[in-house]
UniProtKB/Swiss-Prot annotation:
Keyword set, alphabetical order: Ribonucleoprotein, Ribosomal protein, RNA-binding, rRNA-binding
Purpose: One of the primary rRNA binding proteins, it binds specifically to the 5'-end of 16S ribosomal RNA.
GO biological process, alphabetically ordered: translation
Pfam family, one: Ribosomal_S17
Designated name of the protein: Small ribosomal subunit protein uS17
């Protein structure tokens, strides 16, 4: 194999909706799926708890999360990078 090994870990992009916990953020990931019968695109969403070691991400930030080993009962994702900072109005 001369090619570089690809990462088998899943990555998702979502929006931080809560950063109140210590070293943890709640990330809302939205997916558009086509309804099997009617053909309309519907938004499906799910929340993930992700590890934020430095407490540097705040509500409204778009972040990329990567699947990891279980860190706690509900946390098995780690924030890998900031995609877009929250807009200040």
């Amino acid at each position: 194999m001369t090619e570089a090994a690809t990462s088998l870990k899943r990555t998702l992009v979502g929006r931080v909706v809560s950063s109140k916990m210590d070293k943890t953020v709640t990330v809302l990931v939205e997916n558009r799926v086509k309804h099997p019968l009617y053909g309309k695109y519907v938004v499906r969403s799910k929340k993930y708890h992700a590890h934020d070691e430095a407490n540097q991400y705040k509500e409204g930030d778009r972040v990329e999360i990567v699947e990891s080993r279980p860190i706690s009962r509900t946390k098995a994702w780690v924030v890998s990078r900031l995609v877009e900072a929250a807009r200040v109005i």
